[in-house]
Amino acid sequence: MALTCTDMSDAVAGSDAEGLTADAIVVGAGLAGLVAACELADRGLRVLILDQENRANVGGQAFWSFGGLFLVNSPEQRRLGIRDSHELALQDWLGTAAFDRPEDYWPEQWAHAYVDFAAGEKRSWLRARGLKIFPLVGWAERGGYDAQGHGNSVPRFHITWGTGPALVDIFVRQLRDRPTVRFAHRHQVDKLIVEGNAVTGVRGTVLEPSDEPRGAPSSRKSVGKFEFRASAVIVASGGIGGNHELVRKNWPRRMGRIPKQLLSGVPAHVDGRMIGIAQKAGAAVINPDRMWHYTEGITNYDPIWPRHGIRIIPGPSSLWLDAAGKRLPVPLFPGFDTLGTLEYITKSGHDYTWFVLNAKIIEKEFALSGQEQNPDLTGRRLGQLLRSRAHAGPPGPVQAFIDRGVDFVHANSLRELVAAMNELPDVVPLDYETVAAAVTARDREVVNKYSKDGQITAIRAARRYRGDRFGRVVAPHRLTDPKAGPLIAVKLHILTRKTLGGIETDLDARVLKADGTPLAGLYAAGEVAGFGGGGVHGYRALEGTFLGGCIFSGRAAGRGAAEDIR
C-alpha cells in the first residue's frame, strides 16, 4: 500500500529537515499513529509523522492483521441471534482483566471507556469512514470458567471485510493529499527533548534509504541526524513483540519459566525502543510484565521476518496434548484461554504442545491469522470465499501448510501418526500408549448425545450458535473414524505478539509521570501505551480489542493533543 499524501523521501538529511515546522509530531506510522494524525489534521493542525521504517510499512502490525474488531450488540450479532449488552461486555472485560494493582487505576478507567465505545459509537464512527464488516461474527476466547471469570460470553469478533489492509486504508485515505500532513520515513527517534518540565520535540537518527518489502528487516546504518520541535509529541511506536530480549526480560514470574524457543508473530522493527526512551524523559511505565503471546504458533514456511510464525485460529475440536502426550486440563481447549494455556505450557518444562485432529476437523476449524493467509477475505472476493468454503478440503493457505509446513504430520493410523510426531526435530519422544489412551477416552465420549467430557460438551454448546454450526465447528465424531481421516498432528510453538502494559496515560492520552501528574507535551497511544492507560486489558484480552484499542487510544491522543495545543 503506497501513500499518495504529501510525503517526504525516506532519508532527509538533518539540514534539509530543519525548516520543517509542525504543531504535533507523531512517532510511529502504525494504526494508532495514523488515527491520531487524522484527528489532528481534521482540526487544522500541522502534523509530522516519523517512522524508522520505509513507506512500505505504513500501517504497522495492523496491516498484517485479520482485521478483528470487538463490537457489542451490533446488527451483525443480532442477525445471528446473539443477545449482547454493555453490561455483559463490561462484566466479561473486568472478569478477564482482573485488575488488582494500585497502578491499575487508569487502565480500569480506560476499560470502562473502551467498552462504552465498543457498545456505542465505534461501529457507526468506523462505518462513516468506510468500514465494511463480514457478516459472520467469531467467538474468540470462550473462557470456560464462571460467569465473572475470563472470556467472551457471546461471539464478538467482527472481521473487517478486506482484513487489516482495508482497516488501515480507511485512515490512509483521510491523510492523502493533505498539505498539513508530512511523513518522514527512516527517521528513528532516539530522544525526547524535555525543556522546562515539558516535552518540546524529538532528536534522532536518519537511517539509510531502504527498499525492503513490508515487514522485512531493514538497515540501521546512520546517514544523518535530525531534530524537530512541536507543541505536542504523540508516541505511537508499538510494543516489544519483535524484541525477544525484552520479552524475556519482562517475562512474568507467575507464568513460569522463560521459553527458550519463541516464534515471532510481528516484524523485528516492533522493538519497544520508545518505551525506554519515554521512560528516560519522565514517563511512567506500568505493568511491563503483562503480555499476550499465542500458544498455537506454527513456523512460516515462507518467512518475511526472522523466526516468522503464523498463528492458527482454531475451532474447539482438536485434541490438545502437551509435550509428554497428556491432554491439557479443563478448560484449556482450543480457543478458550490463551494465557491460561501459556502458563500451563511454560510450567510443563517444555516450549511446545500438539494438536491431534483429522482431515474433517482441519477442513472446517483451521483458520490462519493474518491478512496474507486469508486472500479471499483480504481481497474482498466473495465468490472465491464461497467457493473455498463449499469446496471439499481445507482452505488453500491451510493446505499449503499441510503440504509444506515443518510442523505438520499426517498418517492413516494413530500408531503411524505418533511415530511421525516423534520424527520431528527437538521433541521429547512420545509414548504411543499415553497418546492412544487420551484419544480413545475422548472418542468414547462422542457415542452419546451427552457427555461428561468438558470439551465435547463445549463443542455441542458452540454448535448451538449459527455462526459456529455453519462455518466453524464440526459435529462431534471420533478422531479415529476412518471416514474423517487421515489423522493429523501439528506441533505448536509459543508465538510472541502483544504488549499489554506500557506508558501510563489519562483518558486524554496525556502521558503521566511517576507522581501521577501529566508530562506536558507528551501523549501515547496504541500498544506502546498498553492500548490505553498503560494496560486497558489487564492480564488477559478478549480478542478484537487490539486494533480497536489502537483506534480508540489514537483518537483520544489526537483529540487530547489538539485541545491542549489550542
Swiss-Prot record:
Annotated residues that bind FAD are located at 23-54
Q: Which InterPro entries match?
A: FAD-dep_OxRdtase_2_FAD-bd (IPR003953), FAD/NAD-bd_sf (IPR036188), KsdD_DH (IPR014614), Succ_DH/fumarate_Rdtase_cat_sf (IPR027477)
Q: What is its EC number?
A: 1.3.99.-
Q: Does the keyword Signal apply?
A: no
UniProt keywords (A-Z) are: FAD, Flavoprotein, Lipid degradation, Lipid metabolism, Oxidoreductase, Steroid metabolism
Q: Name the NCBIfam families for this protein.
A: PRK12834.1 (NF009472)
Q: Which prosthetic group or cofactor does it need?
A: FAD
Q: Which GO terms describe its biological process?
A: lipid catabolic process; steroid biosynthetic process
- Which top-level group of life is the source organism from? Bacteria
Instruction: Indicate what this protein is called per its UniProt record.
Output: KsdD-like steroid dehydrogenase MT0809
Q: Name one GO molecular function term.
A: steroid dehydrogenase activity, acting on the CH-CH group of donors
Q: In which pathway does it act?
A: Lipid metabolism; steroid biosynthesis
Q: Which organism is it from?
A: Mycobacterium tuberculosis (strain CDC 1551 / Oshkosh)
Recorded family membership: Belongs to the FAD-dependent oxidoreductase 2 family.
